[in-house]
Amino acid sequence: MPELPEVETTVRGLVPFLEGQRLAAVTTFRPDLRRPFPVDLAQRLTGATVTRLSRRAKYGIVSTDRDDHMIFHLGMSGRWRTEGGEPGKHDHLLLETGAGHRLFLHDPRRFGSIDLVAGDPLASFAAFVTLGPEPLSDDFDAALLARAFAARRAPVKAMLLDQNVVAGLGNIYVCEALNMARISPLMPAAGVPKAKLAALVSAIRAVLTAAIAAGGSTLRDFLSPDGDLGYFAKDWRVYGREGEACECGGAIVRVVQSGRSTFYCRKCQR
């Protein structure tokens, strides 16, 4: 599933094609993805001008001068493509601009979603109401983690994947950050020493910043809007590297936590 860096890469890739552009036509090629498209999607967006593109957690937001906001989630296999042409088998939504750009939402597995809200999307979209802070914002710090982790027996990895604790983190980048901070993903959250919480915050910021700069990670389906791969996968410290050597010299192992693969080094992550 695309995580924060992939969605940020997508939003940045859409800006040159959508921001400041009038939406000349909006076309859906099926009635639904994970859930139905909004019935008034085309009516409310056609003729509107896109004023801003932004991101919250793993969602992208397309805002218009009508104070309508189209919120997209890429699901497991979704991506936007900007090369134009005719719709393909797995293209389910088309945005056409007055400048002639044709942007397709491509989603083979159809686990993505499109929502449309009026007014402030951060206040009016239900999925945003309980989200934790953005990990690259000033609101995310060691004190916040200390409060969230207090008396919690759940593994630290599970807590970091909880979108109510911190928004946008997923399996890949949590594995990477825990390795950088030298913290075992199996450790109960309450057991993480306070001295290590600042290191964990720094590691999360560093991993996400590097991943965004590299265009995210391509695991199976993800491509940026212009069709580029996400090159951060070449720099993974532990993710997907079972049996290889950690930079400390220890062996990277894979375990399963809550149905997800966890990669870490038993030598340096304690």
Swiss-Prot record:
Which cofactors? Zn(2+)
- Keyword check for Acetylation, yes or no: no
A GO BP term here is: base-excision repair
Gene3D superfamilies under this entry?
A: 1.10.8.50, MutM-like, N-terminal
Q: What is its EC number?
A: 3.2.2.23, 4.2.99.18
Which InterPro entries does UniProt cross-reference here?
Answer: DNA_glyclase/AP_lyase_DNA-bd, DNA_glyclase_Znf_dom_DNA_BS, Formamido-pyr_DNA_Glyclase, FPG_cat, MutM-like_N-ter, Ribosomal_uS13-like_H2TH, Znf_DNA_glyclase/AP_lyase, Znf_FPG/IleRS
User: One Pfam annotation, family name?
Assistant: H2TH
GO MF assignments:
8-oxo-7,8-dihydroguanine DNA N-glycosylase activity; class I DNA-(apurinic or apyrimidinic site) endonuclease activity; damaged DNA binding; zinc ion binding
Catalytic residues of the enzyme: 2-3, 58, 260
Q: Which UniProt keywords apply?
A: DNA damage, DNA repair, DNA-binding, Glycosidase, Hydrolase, Lyase, Metal-binding, Multifunctional enzyme, Zinc, Zinc-finger
Keyword presence, Lyase: yes
Q: Where are the zinc fingers (FPG-type)?
A: 237-270
> In which residues is DNA bound?
90, 109, 152
Give the cofactor binding note.
Binds 1 zinc ion per subunit.
Quaternary structure? Answer: Monomer.
Task: Extract the NCBIfam families matched here.
Answer: fpg, PRK01103.1
Functionally, this protein is described as follows:
Involved in base excision repair of DNA damaged by oxidation or by mutagenic agents. Acts as a DNA glycosylase that recognizes and removes damaged bases. Has a preference for oxidized purines, such as 7,8-dihydro-8-oxoguanine (8-oxoG). Has AP (apurinic/apyrimidinic) lyase activity and introduces nicks in the DNA strand. Cleaves the DNA backbone by beta-delta elimination to generate a single-strand break at the site of the removed base with both 3'- and 5'-phosphates.
Q: Which family does it belong to?
A: Belongs to the FPG family.
PANTHER family in the record: FORMAMIDOPYRIMIDINE-DNA GLYCOSYLASE
This protein is called Formamidopyrimidine-DNA glycosylase
**What is the gene called?**
mutM
